[in-house]
């Protein structure tokens, strides 16, 4: 959603801002806008179905498999990413003026986007904290652990909504009244010039801290600690785990480090640059590049946290084969698989005789011998233990 800086609020009876073009968009701003649209289109096209499949598989498997704290955190991460991707088409079309809306609709879209992004980053930090507790064996098993996890997730979403509350307060509809183009409407976040170095700067710094610096510090601290703990394990297990952790950490830093740098530069520009057409175009171009970066996590998280794991791939195969849609069928197959693992399966004799036929023949032989006054034959010997 674009950020507009204005000198006065010109609203009509529909509470829409009317804006006449005074600053011509620069070439860099046009290129940045086209790049943002292309990247977001790719994220929606690929990340949307991927997050939907991962979330559906995770929710179906939660019905048949035991649910743990990491599983609930993963489910919440996929849900937050899917909701973020769901808001992108409206924001893309609104920025291009291809879809109209009301001020209330723009406020809801702004709240949904910033809240779901914040919840996604917070869930990543919860996953890192949970793994730290598992290493130190500080987790508690019991009936209360699941309730505590749900309480933590509820607090996370409530805090995300509170952190995202400034966005809908300043979101509104802007009506473009250009003389050489057709009139259209877009959703914007509007700040007057006297709010640039106060409200807008605070908003930029808050996003930089919550979406950028805090996740980088938390993830870096945990995985450095996790790498040190790997030295106590065997070489084979250490090499396999280290490969996964390195991939996870590098992917996160490759996405987050440019975001922190761009947002820091953007915050510096808001505080120090003068307000004129050149700096406004430059600031808008930097903001467009910055707001694309968090959306990349919606594309990477399903791959890193789901498809790189063996357990999820097995459950995904069960899901696409239809075995997870019936909870009773899934539990029956799991019980049958457990019986095969616990009890050894002995080879059948060369003559194929079912158990019911063998029992019926033996009963008939016993009744015939008793009628003749002869003792019944001894029971057959048990099968050898190493069958």
UniProtKB/Swiss-Prot annotation:
Principal location listed in the UniProt entry: host cell
A biological process term (GO) from this entry: cell chemotaxis
Extracellular topological domain residue ranges: 1-33, 95-107, 170-204, 269-285
Segments in the Cytoplasmic topological domain: 62-71, 130-150, 225-244, 310-387
Keyword Protein biosynthesis part of the UniProt annotation: no
Subcellular location: Host cell membrane
Region (Disordered): 368-387
Sequence intervals crossing the membrane: 34-61, 72-94, 108-129, 151-169, 205-224, 245-268, 286-309
Key words of the record: G-protein coupled receptor, Glycoprotein, Host cell membrane, Host membrane, Membrane, Receptor, Transducer, Transmembrane, Transmembrane helix
Glycosylation sites (chain numbering): 20
Membrane-topology descriptor: Multi-pass membrane protein
GO annotations of cellular component type: host cell plasma membrane; membrane
A molecular function GO annotation: C-C chemokine binding
Pro residues biased stretches: 374-387
Family matches, as InterPro entries: CCR1-9-like, GPCR_Rhodpsn, GPCR_Rhodpsn_7TM
PANTHER family: C-C CHEMOKINE RECEPTOR TYPE 10, CELL ADHESION MOLECULE
Protein task: Plays an important role in vivo, in particular in the dissemination to or replication in the salivary gland.
Family listed: Belongs to the G-protein coupled receptor 1 family.
Protein name: G-protein coupled receptor homolog R33
UniProt organism field: Rat cytomegalovirus (strain Maastricht)
